[in-house]
Amino acid sequence: MTRTPRIAYISTFVPKRCGLATYTHHLREAVLLAKGKRREGGFPAAVPPPDPVVCLCHAEETGQYSLPWQIPLVKQRREDYRAIAQRINASSVDVVSLQHEFGIFGGVAGEYVLELLRHLEKPVVTTFHTVFAQPSPPHTDVQREIAALSSHLLVMNRLAIDDLRGQLRVPAWKISYIPHGAPVPPQEDRTRKRREYGW
């Protein structure tokens, strides 16, 4: 039997109150379920879960990420980005899922993420959560290099495909559109909510 690929996620992550953190949490949970992991009490049954998350955070938040599969990355420590790349390279991770939003990474326009990408030896699939229709430096330069260093790009807005192709000259074969989606609440939550609203 062949094993399922191991994915390392790079993003903000819960308990941080951030849309990207919530998105990555739900994405990881859905992938674990698709890979056949059972949920118990809302958490994957595998201990520790196989897919690590590099959790972007501030120095004072690192203690929030203490589970064995959580790897805190202090966003303003440039040297830590290379160390994370080396750690992923030495692991059994097969692919990296980078969730990109300019504000979550350190440096000008989030440029520190480039330090990580330049040293990664694993394939990277980057989800661009923001693509500017009229990009300008330094955002253009950072996003162009991220695109060049990524094996594939995902966007959740069809218009972003044309923006990446036109402004950044990314080839069409390298970009895929996926709908953002939303988590499906458990049946008991739906039933309770319906009662609360008198349905």
Q: Can you say where each PLM-predicted feature lies in the sequence?
A:
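A short helix/loop element that forms part of the nucleotide-sugar donor recognition site in Leloir-type
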Residues: 186-199
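N-terminal subdomain of nucleotide-sugar transferases
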Residues: 1-71, 91, 150
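Carbohydrate-associated surface elements
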Residues: 159, 181
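Phosphate- and divalent-cation-binding pockets in alpha/beta enzyme and binding domains
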Residues: 163-166
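Short N-terminal targeting/anchoring amphipathic segment
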Residues: 71-73, 84-110, 125-127
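Hydrophobic residues at beta-strand termini and immediately following loops
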Residues: 178
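A short, histidine- and acid-enriched strand-loop-helix "catalytic/donor-clamping" loop
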Residues: 101-105, 122-138, 152
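Membrane-proximal helix-turn-helix segments that form the acceptor-binding/catalytic region
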Residues: 115-119, 137-153
